[in-house]
């Protein structure tokens, strides 16, 4: 009887631990369609401190699960199309915040030679992901904006920066960047 009780307790304990480990995954799985490699060719916006204006760039993005699917790491690098000079590089860590049961973000990187960090939170509506961001550069520039990612299909999403407030001044919404998946072989007819 004692051994049966220990076995039952062990099964219940392990089941509870596995359930607890799935909470973060269950919250973050709405971002799972983004897992993979993406790219876009577009013009630099010139909005972020250190970023050139209206220059042809190539942006590469990667989304991956980390730490046993308890977080998602987004990394990117943008460089000039002509000579591959770095324009942006950065990362965002998406995690489940247990106190609010919402997805929170931590950001860091460079725009040109200007270092910045930030934080944010995620809201979802249909196939659109809204990341509300607050950033601060090493030089003291404060920028708030919303990054809007709209899933078009499994091979593409639209990426846009909206609702800009930089040092208290409104800035117009930026053009949509068309992102395409580059880690899946094209389907053959």
What spans do the regions from the language model cover?
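Short, Lys/Arg-enriched, disordered terminal segments
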Residues: 1-5, 189
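Sec-dependent N-terminal signal peptides
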Residues: 4-16
């Amino acid at each position: 009887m004692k051994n049966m009780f220990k076995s039952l307790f062990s099964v219940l304990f392990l089941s509870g631990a596995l359930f607890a480990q799935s909470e973060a995954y269950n919250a973050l799985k709405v971002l799972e369609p983004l897992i993979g490699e993406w790219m876009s060719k577009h013009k630099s916006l010139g909005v972020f401190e250190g970023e050139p204006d209206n220059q042809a760039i190539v942006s590469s993005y990667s989304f991956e699960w980390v730490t046993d699917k308890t977080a998602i790491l987004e990394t990117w690098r943008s460089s000039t199309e002509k000579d591959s000079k770095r324009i942006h590089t950065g990362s965002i860590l998406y995690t489940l915040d247990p106190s609010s049961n919402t997805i929170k973000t931590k950001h860091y990187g460079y725009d040109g030679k200007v270092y910045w960090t930030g934080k944010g939170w995620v809201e979802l509506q249909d196939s659109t992901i809204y990341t509300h961001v607050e950033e601060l550069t090493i030089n003291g520039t404060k920028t708030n904006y919303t990054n809007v990612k709209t899933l078009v299909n499994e091979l593409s999403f639209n990426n846009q920066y909206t609702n800009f407030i930089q040092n208290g001044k409104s800035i117009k919404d930026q053009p949509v960047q068309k992102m395409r998946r580059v880690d899946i072989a094209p389907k053959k007819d």
